[in-house]
């Protein structure tokens, strides 16, 4: 009875972890950015002034951007909801042009360093998703049997995927805080527009990832415990 409960909750947490991984992997909202350029003439002033801003959102596959008119004190996160986005937007492959890097600067050292860092980030995320999915298939195959090795292998894969995705989250934090060189990008743009500002924040794809990590790690520990229990009782 206790073994069945462990298998049930392990399967439940594992399924939730895989689902969250797939959503975070497939959605392009790991990074949100807003560029405001107040250098044009006849610019409105005041707390409720409306400005034309450029919004970016980026994930594993794509980096997209679109123009949006908003008030100075508006909530940036709300502007990225599908219902609030522009009818058309421009997109490019994120691994070739991660924000704020641009392929026009392909000869610069910072661009190549960003691509290398981004490449490792992509690899860790892809490995995390694949490892969790394979672990899920192993557990499904182990369900009709009492083979402790399959349960332990599945549990180990879930824990490995949790560690890989934890590295993805940590690397993304470092990317936003230092590697992407937001300050250098802002300084460069301010040479042409002294009132240029850029705001960068973590998107909901990033915020989902820790929940997937928790579920996969917990599922992995449960399946390791199930495998150990089966092994003890079959001796």
Curated annotation (Swiss-Prot):
Gene3D superfamilies: 1.20.140.150. Residues 144-155, 227-235 are cytoplasmic. The keyword Magnesium does not apply. Keywords: Cell membrane, Glycoprotein, Membrane, Myogenesis, Signal, Transmembrane, Transmembrane helix. GO terms for cellular component: plasma membrane. Its main location: membrane. It holds the Pfam family Claudin_2. Residues 1-33 form the signal peptide. It is a multi-pass membrane protein. Belongs to the TMEM182 family. May negatively regulate myogenesis and skeletal muscle regeneration. This is Transmembrane protein 182. It comes from Xenopus tropicalis (Western clawed frog). The lineage of its organism: Eukaryota, Metazoa, Chordata, Craniata, Vertebrata.
């Amino acid at each position: 009875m206790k073994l069945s409960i462990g298998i049930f909750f392990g399967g439940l947490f594992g399924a939730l972890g895989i689902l969250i991984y797939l959503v975070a992997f497939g959605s392009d909202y790991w990074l949100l950015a807003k560029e405001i350029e107040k250098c044009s003439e006849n610019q409105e002033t005041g707390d409720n002034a409306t400005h034309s801003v450029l919004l970016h959102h980026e994930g594993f596959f794509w980096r997209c951007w679109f123009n949006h008119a908003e008030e100075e004190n508006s909530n940036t996160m709300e502007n990225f909801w599908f219902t609030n986005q522009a009818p058309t937007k421009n997109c490019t492959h994120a691994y070739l042009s991660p924000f704020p890097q641009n392929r026009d600067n392909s000869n610069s050292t910072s661009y190549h360093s960003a691509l290398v860092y981004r490449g490792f980030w992509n690899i860790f995320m892809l490995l995390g998703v694949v490892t969790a999915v394979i672990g899920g298939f192993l557990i499904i195959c182990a369900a009709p049997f009492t083979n402790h090795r399959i349960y332990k292998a599945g549990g180990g894969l879930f824990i490995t995927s949790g560690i890989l995705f934890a590295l993805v989250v940590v690397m993304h934090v470092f990317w936003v805080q230092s590697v992407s060189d937001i300050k250098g990008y802002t300084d460069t743009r301010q040479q042409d527009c002294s009132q240029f500002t850029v705001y960068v924040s973590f998107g909901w794809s990033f915020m989902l990832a820790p929940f997937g990590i928790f579920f996969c790690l917990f599922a992995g520990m449960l399946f390791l415990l199930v495998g150990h229990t089966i092994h003890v009782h079959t001796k």
